Amino acid sequence: MYKFRIQGSDKPLSGEVTISGAKNAALPILFAALLAEEPVEVANVPKLRDVDTTIELLQRLGAKVSRNGSVHIDASEVNNFCAPYDLVKTMRASIWALGPLVARFGKGQVSLPGGCAIGARPVDLHIHGLEQLGATIKLEDGYVKAEVDGRLKGAHIVMDKVSVGATITVMCAATLAEGTTILENAAREPEIVDTAHFLNAIGAKVSGMGTDTITIEGVERLGGGYHEVVADRIETGTFLVAAAVSGGKVVCKNTKASLLESVLAKLEEAGAKVESGEDWISLDMTGRELKAVNIRTAPHPAFPTDMQAQFTLLNMMAKGPGIITETIFENRFMHIPELQRMGAHAEIEGNTAICGDTDGLSGAQVMATDLRASASLVIAGCIAKGETIVDRIYHIDRGYDKIEDKLTALGANIERVRSSEL
């Protein structure tokens, strides 16, 4: 087991950071490669624990996978149609194997998934979508089992609620369905758009991605192709917040402002100077006063729930108060008690947190509770007075590619240490 040991400083975090590919696009794209009868190459895939788990799962299913810069996948000889519990238990994204398996092979089963403990994220919407495409679904022995005689059938589907995961499942499965599928009330996130671009690169006919109505014209087979994963907008936002709360200046490279317009608008409202070009975003907080902002999470293009914890920290350190309202997940304020251990000011009322006017943070031993919350603890440690130990950093490794190296390049004093060394 590893932990982060951070020596806090009042020195601003400043410099350049290269943003990795988006985890939330890379994972569905890697699973969607199961649809392809010929080899595919996926570039700009981040080096993350969840990516490693996905690659191992694809290999268990019979795909040939290698990584040499890009990830190369040959799913032409897939011969196992079951995603087992020992892999799925660590990663909720494993459910994305089900749609491609049943669409291409007529059958598939996936153990009920695990992942971050941030509330109920049931697979009901995935199941209902596949059933509307003609699949028969059973829940047996802890597995979701899907079958279809012949091909799936295109359908007009109206999602009961906006769901990124279920939108991806239905969109991928419908590519090999007979006929046209119209998916209404679809999620609009950039990662869904990127997954659709990958599907089209291997021969699918997907249109309307990025709107709430996606149209998929089914084809008989999908071939091979090349795709480069879109930049990680959440990693981008995380480093921009790190600069903002430390009074620094950072340039994020290999990313695009169009991916996180709602986040950039709130950073400007908080007092930061934000500029951008074709493939970079800069934030300058030098000599500026940090002001608390009101945040309400909602599906894209509104403010993303995955940036909520980082802005909770920003509000705590700003001239406040600022109100954070979480509408996507329940139980997503687990980072607040940990930040309070460091001296942060916040009050929680249901799905709302009121925070601001914290007079500095003090280093403490804190525990990462989920992926994005853990990032806020790491940033807090960088700006706190004294030493901070962040435990259970495997959560961070699920979504951030070498976060300690990138923070070190910005001037942070952070190291990964074995628990036995502390």
From Swiss-Prot:
It is found in: Cytoplasm. Its EC number is 2.5.1.7. Phosphoenolpyruvate binds at K23, N24. It catalyses: phosphoenolpyruvate + UDP-N-acetyl-alpha-D-glucosamine = UDP-N-acetyl-3-O-(1-carboxyvinyl)-alpha-D-glucosamine + phosphate. Signal peptide: none annotated. Pfam families: EPSP_synthase. GO terms for cellular component: cytoplasm. Pathway: Cell wall biogenesis; peptidoglycan biosynthesis. Its main location: cytoplasm. GO terms for biological process: cell division; cell wall organization; peptidoglycan biosynthetic process; regulation of cell shape; UDP-N-acetylgalactosamine biosynthetic process. UDP-N-acetyl-alpha-D-glucosamine binds at R92, R121, P122, V123, D124, L125, K161, V162, S163, V164, D306, I328. The active site is at C116 (proton donor). Cell wall formation. Adds enolpyruvyl to UDP-N-acetylglucosamine. NCBIfam families: murA, PRK09369.1. Belongs to the EPSP synthase family. MurA subfamily. PANTHER family: UDP-N-ACETYLGLUCOSAMINE 1-CARBOXYVINYLTRANSFERASE (PTHR43783:SF1). This is UDP-N-acetylglucosamine 1-carboxyvinyltransferase.
